[in-house]
């Protein structure tokens, strides 16, 4: 959320609720447009449980303390236990994804290093080839090193022979 969209209003004004409702409606519309759905099995189980007959019967009989009273759960403790289990599963998934992202980052870094080394080696090979093929470069070095018996081709290969 950018700072340009923030509006400061007095406490108790209802415009904030309307904006929240509008943003929720826009998120729901975007979700429907992109056909996004939650694929977590626990969420699907919960929605099936909520939409089941036991839930509808509990809605029809407004008796407090009855089974299925709290969002399709028998009691608050069972609802909290389900929520804790879900959070533990989500934390495990988060750790797994974080490890996967770190491995991908390391692989990407390794690939970048390999590519940089390969490009550097190509530049060195190209410069060496230019020195070998350039006619003036060999003549400039020839008088200085000819008395030692060094040739132009042997200098670039780093092997020195006597003539």
UniProtKB/Swiss-Prot annotation:
Q: Which InterPro entries match?
A: FAM167 (IPR024280), FAM167_domain (IPR051771)
Keywords on record: Coiled coil
| PANTHER family from the UniProt entry | PROTEIN FAM167A (PTHR32289), PROTEIN FAM167B (PTHR32289:SF4)
Q: What is this protein called?
A: Protein FAM167B
Question: What does the sequence similarity comment in the record state about its family?
Answer: Belongs to the FAM167 (SEC) family.
Q: What highest taxon heads this organism's lineage? A: Eukaryota
Please indicate if the UniProt record lists Coiled coil as a keyword: yes
- The organism encoding this protein is Homo sapiens (Human)
Query: Coiled-coil region(s) at which residues?
Result: 73-132
Q: Which gene encodes it?
A: FAM167B
Write down the Pfam families for this protein, in alphabetical order: FAM167 (PF11652)
């Amino acid at each position: 959320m950018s700072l340009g969209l923030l509006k400061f209003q007095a406490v108790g004004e209802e415009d904030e609720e309307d904006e929240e409702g509008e943003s929720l409606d826009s998120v729901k519309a975007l979700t429907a447009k992109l056909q996004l759905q939650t694929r977590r099995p626990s969420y699907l189980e919960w929605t099936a449980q909520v939409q089941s007959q036991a839930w509808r019967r509990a809605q029809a009989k407004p008796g407090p303390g009855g089974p299925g009273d709290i969002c399709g759960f028998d009691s608050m403790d069972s609802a909290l236990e389900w929520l804790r289990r879900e959070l533990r599963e989500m934390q495990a998934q988060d750790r797994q994804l974080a490890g996967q992202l770190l491995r991908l980052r390391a692989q990407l870094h390794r690939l970048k290093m390999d590519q940089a080394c390969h490009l550097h080696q190509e530049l060195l090979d190209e410069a060496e080839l230019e020195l070998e093929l350039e006619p003036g470069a060999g003549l400039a070095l020839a008088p200085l090193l000819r008395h030692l018996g060094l040739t132009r081709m042997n200098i670039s290969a780093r092997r020195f022979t006597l003539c």
